[in-house]
């Protein structure tokens, strides 16, 4: 026998050793589980019993005392705004949402948290929205950085700049009208009023004298095409194709090369394109981001790889690529066309510095998110309410018929409809019940603390005030606060109207209020005036009593089937 071989342990000894280790596996696993539980639970229990922010006295869900996972679960179930509102109705104006977070619901509280005099900064929640290393004007938590960006970008959304883009936006209203006219055409040609088919990805069916289809995708097609044209000089082409897709470069690298203005690479960057379902990508990313945003930072990457979050996790690089491709296309065109990106390219901060590549891209991504989804959501919800109540629709159409009498264009001119009292009331009521974001966005109480509703909140406490609940305060809006009633804006006394306006914040308030307010209001006026002057809309007989929503970050309608007919 070889001497080296004799040094090896006998085979039987090895087998016995392995069997011994195998018998220890349950014990090892038990120890690991205990260690993980200790690491996870101990800080939770310590925070609860130590109560560093002195929030134990405030009511709220039992689990919210121990962990932020409660609110993440509610968000993942698409019940964010409505659940927090229910908590306030049950427990009062101050509700605890997590170990360090309280929600405060009143007009005074909203102003205290978000107003110009508030020293509160955005919470770590916003870190989850960072898809680039450089933050956007929305997700930056640094006050000085936000001020710098606001100075650069404010002119882009000024009323004068928005008016200059009206003719560009009009093109997409015209395409929407043309497509809806095409859908309505079979109603006059069918035998016994029945036919069905598809236009792009949209199924339609004629029943009686109306064509029935889901209008929600159309509002998204319109908003995505509008913002991509206004921002980057060309539409995504969703309206024409009736399809929620966009084309991106097959690699971020090629988009970056084009944006860097190295023209030797620009053709290469445009040659290999990939079609992505942009509307789905945006929805998946927002749902994923908000569901994880309240969890500890170290947990987020782990949860992001779970099967239930996989689509959202994969959506982040796709949306980044979409913004990079949009910027690349615009820069490679070398046009002097006036649009939002040209404003960003010309913009300079107080030191005379322009935006760099990554900063352009992160702001472009924000334009796609804000412009592609938010106005579409409010438009669809408002159309749902109008289609549900034919008396409201008749009043609106009577006002529009007078205002647009003699107007030859298929699209309502903004100047003709911007000051119509009943249209204004309808839009305000739509924004009240379906503001872009219903949940309270979190802020961190600054040094020295903050007093809200007579209660002192310690420095570092996270505080939010929900728009959804603010807009349904019965003390301000009356017993019918949960109902769509445009007349409330016309019937209120001067004092009541003043109180209503103090409790009306669809675009938030203060230094972090939405810069796109003027654009959104212009688009809502033109869209709703154009649609309801040209068409009659009704809901199905078995339509749900409430519009089905994905109530996560944005309150997104899931579906809205309407019966559409051209008006005589």
Swiss-Prot record:
CDD domains: CYP67-like (cd11061). Glycans are attached at residues 321, 377. Pathway: Secondary metabolite biosynthesis. Pfam families: p450 (PF00067). Its EC number is 1.-.-.-. One of its GO terms (molecular function) is oxidoreductase activity, acting on paired donors, with incorporation or reduction of molecular oxygen. Its cofactor is heme. It is found in: Membrane. The chain crosses the membrane at residues 21-41. Heme binds at residue 514. One of its GO terms (cellular component) is membrane. It is a single-pass membrane protein. SUPFAM superfamilies: Cytochrome P450. PANTHER family: BENZOATE-PARA-HYDROXYLASE (PTHR24305:SF29), CYTOCHROME P450 (PTHR24305). Cytochrome P450 monooxygenase that is able to use 3,5-dimethoxy-trans-stilbene and 3,5,4'-trimethoxy-trans-stilbene as substrates for oxidation. This is Cytochrome P450 monooxygenase 41. The lineage of its organism: Eukaryota, Fungi, Dikarya, Basidiomycota, Agaricomycotina.
